Amino acid sequence: MHHPEAPASQAPASPSLDPAALVSRLRATFAGGRTRPLAWREQQLTQLRSLFTEHREDIADALYADLRKPRSEAYTTEVDFPVREIDHTLAHLEEWLSPQPLASGALAGLPEGSTAGTQYEPLGTVLIIAPWNYPVQLLLVPLVGALAAGNAVVLKPSEITPATSELIARLIPEYLDTDAVAVVEGGVPETTALLAQRYDHIFYTGNGAVGRIVMRAAAEHLTPVTLELGGKSPVFVDRGVDVAAVATRLAEAKFRNAGQTCVAPDYVLTDPDTASVLAKELRTAVERVFSADPKSSETYGRIVNERHFDRVSALLGSGTTAFGGQSDRDDVYIAPTVLTDVRPDEPVMREEIFGPVLPIVNVDGLDEAIAFINDRDKPLALYVFTESGTTRERIAAETSSGAVGYGLPLAHLTVSDLPFGGVGESGMGSYHGRYSMETFSHRKAVLAKPLS
């Protein structure tokens, strides 16, 4: 989800943090049965909803302090989206949790009167580790699933967004059961200390390098993991499409949050003629969405810090700059930038960009685009603009990605009834809606035959 450099924090672990005691306390709560009743789960979710609605402005203020995130964007992605997830979960939770009996025909080999089915049980005590790019949503939407499933939860917000982390650490104890939900702030030492403990599930959103660290720690206790990672999400633009419409949708999806979105379009594959028109239309679309001067626009964000600014800035030399390219380190500002005639071996194509830079790579057509995509790690998302049903069928059948979107990038993650997650290097496991509850649950087989 964020760039594969772990924070270079050398600070000692907080002397007040006793991870073993913390996890032990939460385990005791879970063992006592407190988190299992449906009423407790619904009450916690309702309280979490109140946290969002009563502190909407505080959340937006913290996100602006940390990320210069525009208020409208903060409301949409970090308040309204989690509230919709909570509402969807509350509306369906009792139905999701109800035991699922097998049809009698499935029990033909068993004694008469036998019944069987499945039911969900909570896993126990879980750890959720969030990144900095959507520091509220990516911490608290997984929490919705963990609470819905009836677990005790340790939350670890990102230290790279300190104002948001501090706000969450202050508000969670005011709204949620402090014997069942705890927030631990801090950097690498605190996270390392937390990972040394035994959990019943670990949910991590971030980069693959740290994902491997999380998975190694989990292996010590045979703890299952969900890894929501990232990668270079490609866009294929077919010949003959409405390029102006494509440009508008790409500009919105790519440059919101200054490109710091795990499923943002990373690069474009298209033929040279379409590439030339697309670059011009993207300039028009960017000016329409973010004004001719995005630096002074209230709708355009900033890079999270100088380290990530330096990393993204180093990618600006690839290809030919069609427009953009301006930057200001003191303001951690990089303009929306489109690069054309980019070669596959250039720096901008070697890593997830995670910034407002969109390279366009020329391909001859669909066959070459599919080969290009399949020659690289499986992405978190793949986007296609085409009018051809055959092209859509071939993309679905001949490529692998966490999700595929035809015509509307990013939209799939807003649909609660769709699983959100990666495959291969882009992650494992999924969540949102019912899938969140299932991620934090064990689906247990139950069979019964009366003795009389």
Regions of interest found by a model, annotated:
Residues G105-A245, S276, V363:
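Rossmann-like NAD(P) dinucleotide-binding subdomain of oxidoreductase/dehydrogenase enzymes
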Residues F30, R34, R49-F52, R56, ...:
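Structural signal for hydrophobic packing residues in well-ordered secondary-structure cores
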Residues R41, I86, G150, V181, ...:
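Residue-level signal for inorganic ion chemistry
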Residues M1-T115:
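N-terminal Rossmann-like NAD(P)+-binding subdomain of aldehyde/semialdehyde dehydrogenases
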Residues H2, P37, Y333-S452:
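Conserved C-terminal structural/oligomerization subdomain of aldehyde/semialdehyde dehydrogenase
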Residues Q10-P12, A209-R343, Y406:
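ALDH superfamily catalytic-core signature
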Residues A28-R34, I128, V235-V237, Y267-T270, ...:
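Short, well-ordered beta-strand elements within core beta-sheets of diverse protein domains
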Residues P19, L38, R56, V243, ...:
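Residues at or immediately preceding the N-termini of alpha-helices
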